[in-house]
Amino acid sequence: MKILLICFSFLLFFNCISSHSIEIEKLNGYWEIDHINQRKERFEPKGNSPLYDHYFLEYPNGILNKVEIRLDRIIYSSKDIANFKIERLDKKYYIRFKSRWSEWSKQIKHLDSHKLVLEHNKRTFHYKRPDLYEFINDERGK
């Protein structure tokens, strides 16, 4: 009986951990692609001026657009946006995107204040919070 109680406690503990891996309110803001996994390969972004995904969320609806910080340290935003809706099915969260060109969906595998992991078409996209504020404030401090 004692072993059964211990096993049940472990299951409950690990279930609580996994359910807290998605903090949906943390989606708001800027996200920088860290790497992409596909078929056991890891791909990392290359280039001097990375693109960032900017999410604006008023649950359950939101807007996604791409932004870029150029060498002049100004943030440039794409005029193209994708509207989205957060949907929860069977304890899993999905982002349902809709642009003027197409519709697609990504599953949220992990989301907290520092890390976002999305899955789409057998690819896993790993994002991190960029240090944009330090970059912008560095110019003002000079």
Locate predicted features.
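Short, surface-exposed beta-strand-loop junctions and turns on beta-sheet-rich folds
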Residues: 70-73, 101-104, 123-126, 133-134
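N-terminal helix-cap/turn-to-beta initiation motif at the start of protein domains
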Residues: 17-32
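Short, solvent-exposed loop/turn elements at domain surfaces
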Residues: 38-43
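Short beta-strand segments that buttress and anchor functional surface loops
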Residues: 94-99, 118-119
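Edge beta-strand at a domain terminus
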Residues: 80, 117-142
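Sec-dependent N-terminal signal peptides
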Residues: 3-13
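Short, solvent-exposed coil/turn segments at beta-strand boundaries
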Residues: 26-27, 53-63, 88-92, 109-115, ...
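N-terminal glycine/threonine-rich, aromatic-flanked beta-hairpin/loop signature
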Residues: 44-90
